[in-house]
Amino acid sequence: MPEFIRVNYETDRRVFLNGEELGRTNETLNSGAGPFRVDMGVPLTYEPSFRRVNPSGTSSDKPLEVDFTAKSAAP
């Protein structure tokens, strides 16, 4: 069954599910059934370094939202 995720981040980045490139940030992506390890590859300028998700009951207009934020600069 199709499932959908949207990885939210402040800039355009590649999105990886279980190490395989799926698409780009800030777009609705057809992920299929999970569970998945979601990350944005290197450089690791974001946090957390990954998220574990298991999309269920999603649609293209109501994807599972997965949020990442930019790492704070070291003082």
Language-model-detected regions and their locations in the chain:
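Short loop/turn and low-complexity linker motifs enriched in small/turn-promoting residues
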Residues: M1-P75
